[in-house]
Amino acid sequence: CSCSPVHPQQAFCNADIVIRAKAVNKKEVDSGNDIYGNPIKRIQYEIKQIKMFKGPDQDIEFIYTAPSSAVCGVSLDIGGKKEYLIAGKAEGNGNMHITLCDFIVPWDTLSATQKKSLNHRYQMGCECKITRCPMIPCYISSPDECLWMDWVTEKNINRHQAKFFACIKRSDGSCAWYRGAAPPKQEFLDIEDP
């Protein structure tokens, strides 16, 4: 299973459902057959939803994932102690599906800014595009992009820009990194400016 890293804001924008929840039970279930008629197994987590940040008007009861990490299956702690932020795809009927490529992290590892941004701020930036910079030099190709530099500057994708910044559209239609809750003003120097 391989996936490219995403900024938490991208994960929020790409997901159908974003919730804070804990897993209370786990079992293997059949979910139809593959093209050769073999049964497809999935793991079903029964969860207790604590808060929904994005999604349908109903609580999520079950989360499904593939049976092993080799096929991108996610392993959650059951027992109802550990809380997670879980972003994933809707399956209807109060169910969702997650893979290792989705944004799933223990709630207590999120920064205060990330937790606050889930309520409104990431949504404000969903029209912007976050482009990961794998090596210097890298450039934006349009004004609605923000360069995500964590990998280059700190050799880790879960660093400064991921923890403390959102990429928000300004009044002139361009996008810029911003730390705080109001939309950024034009006079701030963009991070990608030389």
Curated annotation (Swiss-Prot):
Region (Involved in metalloproteinase-binding): 1-4, 69-70
GO molecular function: metal ion binding; metalloendopeptidase inhibitor activity; protease binding
GO cellular component labels: extracellular matrix; extracellular space
GO terms for biological process, alphabetical: negative regulation of membrane protein ectodomain proteolysis; response to cytokine; response to hormone
Subcellular location(s) per record: Secreted
Binding site for Zn(2+): 1
Domain NTR: 1-126
Tree of life domain: Eukaryota
Disulphides: 1-72, 3-101, 13-126, 128-175, 133-138, 146-167
InterPro entries in UniProt: Netrin_domain, TIMP, TIMP-like_OB-fold, TIMP_C, TIMP_CS
UniProt KW keywords: Disulfide bond, Metal-binding, Metalloenzyme inhibitor, Metalloprotease inhibitor, Protease inhibitor, Secreted, Zinc
Modification note: The activity of TIMP2 is dependent on the presence of disulfide bonds.
UniProt site (Involved in metalloproteinase-binding): 14, 35, 41
Entry similarity comment: Belongs to the protease inhibitor I35 (TIMP) family.
Known partners and oligomeric status: Interacts (via the C-terminal) with MMP2 (via the C-terminal PEX domain); the interaction inhibits the MMP2 activity.
Functional description taken from the UniProt entry: Complexes with metalloproteinases (such as collagenases) and irreversibly inactivates them by binding to their catalytic zinc cofactor.
Name of the protein in its database record: Metalloproteinase inhibitor 2
